[in-house]
Amino acid sequence: MTLFNPLNSKKRSQQLKQLLDSEKLVILPGCYDALSAKLIEKAGIKAGFMSGFCVSSTRLGMPDTGLISYTEMQDQVRNICNITSIPILFDGDTGWGNAGNVYRTVRGYADAGAAAIMIEDQKWPKKCGHTKGKDVVELDEAKARIKAAADASKLNGDKDILICSHQEA
């Protein structure tokens, strides 16, 4: 058994893109740690999704309201990527702030091995996606976040992580 999986973010993002480009339904079961992600892989499922709600509820017993830090989430990403070979879409919440924070978050997830990251348009600190009264950023800030994520997704001009935009607006 290999402790660390050598697949990098670019290889994983290519795997996920191939799945998404196919004519087949792509199922992304939710995981929250290395074990749950490994169980998804062992079940023969081709990809997964690390949910911020799942991470927050299993680590803190609390809903996804911004209590989990960027560092804690990046640690989860790294642990999951170290033990699995399937591509996983990771919840990047709001990117923990403005466009600069989004850039850092996307690069950090890519460096940890993520195939894809999902960024929300909520204001920081965020509210759980299942609750009412969520505030979203202004259109200019949303555009800046998306641009920052797209810029961060390219290392040396070569895309190495897919970007998904989660819109609450």
Provide a role label for each language-model segment.
Residues 18-75:
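Conserved N-terminal beta1-alpha1 strand-loop-helix module at the mouth
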Residues 27-33, 48-50, 88-92, 117-119, ...:
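Hydrophobic faces of well-ordered beta-strands that scaffold small-molecule active sites
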Residues 84, 88, 92, 96, ...:
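Generic hydrophobic/packing signal
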Residues 8-14, 22, 62-90, 111-112, ...:
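Alpha-helix-loop-beta-strand connector modules within alpha/beta enzyme cores
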Residues 36-42, 96-110:
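Catalytic cores of alpha/beta
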